Structure formats: C-alpha cells, structure tokens
C-alpha cells in the first residue's frame, strides 16, 4: 500500500511519528492520563540550624516520588546583609546544600548560586518571577519566610526523585549553614510527595533509571 511504501522510503525510525497519530483534524480524541495524588509532608532532620552547623534531612519513603523541598522560617530568604537568612552578603561562605543517595553525593548547590544565578535567570513563568529572591532584592509576592532548594528533581515533573525505586538506598539532604546565621525560630522542612497508581508504581520499580 501507499502507507507501506512511504514507511519503507522514510525509515523505521519514523514509525513513532507517523504510525499512530494522536491528533486528527477530522475527529476528536481524548487523551488518557495516569492518576496520581500530591501531599506536602513535614520532614524530620538531624542537627540544629545555626551558624556553621550541619543538618541532615533523611528523605523517608512516605510516598512514591519526591518533587521539591523547601524550608520555612521567619526571614530565612534574606537578602543583602542579614542574620536570619541562609544567604548574606557579609558571610565568608554561603550555605551549602547537597543531595546524597546510597552514600554518594550526586548534586550540590549553595545559597550564592541559588540567589545569585538560579533565581534571577530561571524565572520562566510570571508566578516564579513575582516570587524570586536574589542576593539584593526580594520580589513583591515573596514574604522571605520560605526557602526553596532547587535540586534537579524539583524543576521538572519528568525528573522527580523515584523514591519507590530507591527503597534500598539511603537518601538524604545535607545542609552546611553559613557563618553568622541566626534563625529567628526553629526552621521547618517540607517535601512534596507524589503517590502513584499501581500500574505506574510498577513501572518505576521494574525499570532502570538513569
């Protein structure tokens, strides 16, 4: 048939694009999506937030996936020179955040990068732009009481942390607080857990992840 002739002439790599179209100008299609639920959960941590202190936050398998993590405390998203924020222009070194999986460090950020590079540049939506905290300014919709840790798994739904596939590995975030940091109150750490249906959970447990 003409379709087979076209397939042979174009190549097998084009099967995915032309073989099973999902959109037609002449009929209506309904796309099916998998079911999931989300719930923010408070996370326990080991250590005390304060100047030069180290804090470990174990990521428990309360859900199937983890999308993003943030810290709540009065004035924790400080700008310029301050005492209550994880960043200060007067600090000798910034606060460091590192992600550890199975005893190996897989990602590391610091508050200078977060507020000096990430927040000013990666504002791809109006909502993010109105909440941004940089080294010198805090936008109008940011109260300064929340500090998002922008690890890779919180930026894109396709890169969420598959906790269900890491059940035999210790997963934790380690924080090395900057010098001069004096929290106003006891910080609280939260994580956004995602819960999958049975079929999709099986996909995450049975397949390799890169």
Annotate each predicted stretch with a short phrase:
Residues 1-210:
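Short, low-complexity Pro/Thr/Gly
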């Amino acid at each position: 048939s003409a379709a087979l002739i076209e397939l042979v002439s174009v190549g097998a790599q084009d099967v995915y694009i032309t073989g099973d179209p999902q959109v037609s100008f002449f009929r209506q299609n309904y796309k099916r999506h998998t079911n999931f639920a989300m719930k923010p959960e408070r996370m326990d941590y080991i250590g005390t937030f304060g100047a030069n202190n180290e804090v470990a936050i174990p990521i428990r398998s309360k859900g199937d996936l983890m999308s993003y993590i943030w810290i709540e405390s009065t004035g924790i998203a400080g700008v310029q020179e301050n005492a209550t924020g994880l960043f200060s222009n007067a600090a000798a070194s910034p606060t460091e955040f590192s992600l550890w999986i199975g005893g190996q460090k897989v990602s590391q950020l610091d508050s200078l990068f977060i507020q000096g590079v990430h927040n000013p540049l990666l504002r791809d939506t109006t909502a993010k732009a109105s909440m941004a905290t940089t080294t010198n300014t805090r936008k109008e919709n940011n109260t300064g009481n929340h500090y998002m840790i922008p690890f890779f798994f919180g930026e894109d739904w396709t890169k969420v942390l598959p906790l269900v596939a890491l059940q035999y590995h210790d997963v934790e975030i380690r924080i090395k607080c900057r010098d001069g940091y004096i929290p106003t109150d006891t910080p609280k750490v939260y994580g956004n857990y995602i819960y999958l249906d049975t079929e999709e959970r099986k996909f995450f447990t049975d397949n390799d992840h890169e």
